[in-house]
């Protein structure tokens, strides 16, 4: 306060005001700051005062032959004075307007080819349908998603070589185009762009969009294929969603889908062969998707799906160690465990042989309508934070986490016999038996779990065994979060094939 009074006092003296408004800035440090280096220190200000000048643009002398000195209104378009320090002409912004209206029109045949991804986007939006807007709490999970529809799947390095070859064919520098996709793309693009007048740099940028998959880690609720991600800002907010059906597919989404289907078929066939690993690798090498060898696609494609991960692991590529259980994708974010067989008794005195995970671990659980963070120790749930669209979705997540925790009170809550079978009439493994049992009726599980009083934490509330929210009590270790829970993004160690096969059929 004292400082402000002092400043006010100074400003009221006319001499101060004069010094501040009239004195030139000639302090060396300030001049250095604003004049050293090529980088503009205050671009907005520079633009403002440049545009306030009569001739802020400089152009090649040839412009004087192509543009009249004055426009129809008699305004001067360029100055007869040369630009200081170069032999260029000083030009008015009005010259740009004149050129846009009256300048020569070049052939537009290359535009749809260069700006292909934009033209395709416009078509998808034109033919897409936007449905009603619903207001509800959105559960968004950050996921790695593909943000530019319609691209090929070249690595950044491969694409760079293709772009250099297409756009700057005469530049020096070793470029080795080896893969089929590189060669076909180069040939195709060279033919398309013959006689193209668009600036090479722009062409290079556009080709990059077309050739390389760009991914971002974005909060998403709903469709994650690139044709949904391009309209993310239109389809979901914090408390609303708008239904949307894309007006067309993009080839990269088709490739992702085909890759998943192919990988599943290959894994299924490899499992029953005499040498699963060898046969899986052989099939990956001999399969083509959209004319590109599957092994090449696997190297570039970040799709995370069990069968795809198995194929990647077999090839020795890095994968993220996630697995599915009860319709949720579990991703371990910290901790570790060892597996050990253990026999346990259910509430019906039936003996189950389960694989117990010994050790402290933290997981993110990601499902269609709910997400959660789970912290567990050996056969003990320490903490579960759930976020979901509705009561039903939250209950599903809690059941899966309780079964996954392998706690004794969960196993003792079993009433009746466990005899669930799959579609091929084979008995399910014990963990899935337990899951099915409680998915049918979780009442005993929730009642048996135990409750505790809770502290008031912002954004968190408790949940009682009958699924009603509470601010005082909650099932032991379980809390409901009003915000979404992020999927963890990282590529962990390579899982050997035989291990990942077990991992993917079931986490236990």
From Swiss-Prot:
The keyword Hydrolase appears for this protein: no
A Pfam entry, by short name: Flu_PB2_2nd
GO cellular component: host cell cytosol; host cell mitochondrion
UniProt key word Hydrolase: no
Entry keywords, A to Z: Host cytoplasm, Host mitochondrion
Location of this chain's protein in the cell: Host mitochondrion; Host cytoplasm, Host cytosol
Alphabetical list of InterPro entries matching this protein: Flu_PB2_2nd (IPR049110), Flu_PB2_CAP-bd (IPR048298), Flu_PB2_middle (IPR049111), Flu_PB2_N (IPR049106), PB2_helical (IPR049113)
Top-level division of the source organism's lineage: Viruses
Coiled coil: none
Primary localization class, coarse: host cell
Function summary: May participate in the inhibition of type I interferon induction through inhibition of the host mitochondrial antiviral signaling protein MAVS. The knockout of PB2-S1 has no detectable effects on laboratory infected mice.
Protein's name in the database: PB2-S1
Organism: Influenza A virus (strain A/Wilson-Smith/1933 H1N1)
Taxonomic classification: Viruses, Riboviria, Orthornavirae, Negarnaviricota, Polyploviricotina
Gene from which the chain derives: PB2
């Amino acid at each position: 306060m004292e400082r402000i009074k002092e400043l006010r006092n100074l400003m009221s003296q006319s001499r101060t005001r004069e010094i501040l408004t009239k004195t030139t800035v000639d302090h060396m440090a300030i001049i250095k700051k604003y004049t050293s280096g090529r980088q503009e220190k205050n671009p907005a200000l520079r633009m403002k005062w440049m545009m306030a000048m009569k001739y802020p643009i400089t152009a090649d002398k040839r412009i004087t032959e192509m543009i009249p000195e004055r426009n129809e209104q008699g305004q001067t378009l360029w100055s007869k004075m040369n630009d200081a320090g170069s032999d260029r002409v000083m030009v008015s912004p009005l010259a740009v307007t004149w050129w846009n209206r009256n300048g020569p029109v070049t052939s537009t045949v290359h535009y749809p080819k260069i700006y292909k991804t934009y033209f395709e986007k416009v078509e998808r939006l034109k033919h897409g349908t936007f449905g009603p807007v619903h207001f509800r709490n959105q559960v968004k999970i950050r996921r790695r998603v593909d943000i530019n529809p319609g691209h090929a799947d070249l690595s950044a390095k491969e694409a760079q070589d293709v772009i250099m070859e297409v756009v700057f064919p005469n530049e020096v520098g070793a470029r080795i185009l080896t893969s089929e996709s590189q060669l076909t793309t180069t040939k195709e693009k060279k033919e398309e762009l013959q006689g193209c007048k668009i600036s090479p740099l722009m062409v290079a940028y556009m080709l990059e969009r077309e050739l390389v998959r760009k991914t971002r880690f974005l909060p998403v609720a709903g469709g994650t294929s690139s044709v949904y991600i391009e309209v993310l800002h239109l389809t979901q907010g914090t408390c609303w969603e708008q239904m949307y059906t894309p007006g067309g597919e993009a080839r990269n989404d088709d490739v992702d889908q085909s890759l998943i289907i192919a990988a599943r078929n290959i894994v299924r066939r490899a499992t029953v062969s005499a040498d699963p690993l060898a046969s899986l690798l052989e099939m990956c090498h001999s399969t083509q998707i959209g004319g590109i060898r599957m092994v090449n696609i696997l190297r570039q494609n970040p799709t995370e799906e069990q069968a795809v991960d198995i194929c990647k692991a077999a090839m020795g590529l890095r994968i993220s160690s996630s697995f599915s259980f009860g319709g949720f994708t579990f991703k371990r974010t910290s901790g570790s465990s060892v597996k050990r067989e253990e026999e346990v008794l259910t509430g019906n005195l039936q003996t189950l042989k389960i694989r117990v995970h010994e050790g402290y671990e933290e997981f993110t659980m990601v499902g269609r309508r709910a997400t959660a963070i789970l912290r567990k120790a050996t056969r003990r749930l320490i903490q579960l934070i759930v976020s979901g669209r509705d009561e039903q979705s939250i209950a599903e997540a809690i059941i899966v986490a309780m079964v996954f925790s392998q706690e004794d009170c969960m196993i003792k809550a079993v009433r009746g016999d466990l005899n669930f079978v799959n579609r091929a009439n084979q008995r399910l493994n014990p963990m899935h038996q337990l899951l099915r049992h409680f998915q049918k009726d979780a009442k005993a599980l929730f009642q048996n779990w135990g409750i505790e009083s809770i502290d008031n934490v912002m954004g968190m509330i408790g949940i009682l065994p009958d699924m009603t929210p509470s601010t005082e009590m909650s099932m032991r270790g379980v809390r409901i979060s009003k915000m979404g829970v992020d999927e963890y993004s990282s590529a962990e160690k390579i899982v050997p094939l035989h291990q990942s096969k077990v991992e993917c059929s079931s986490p236990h």
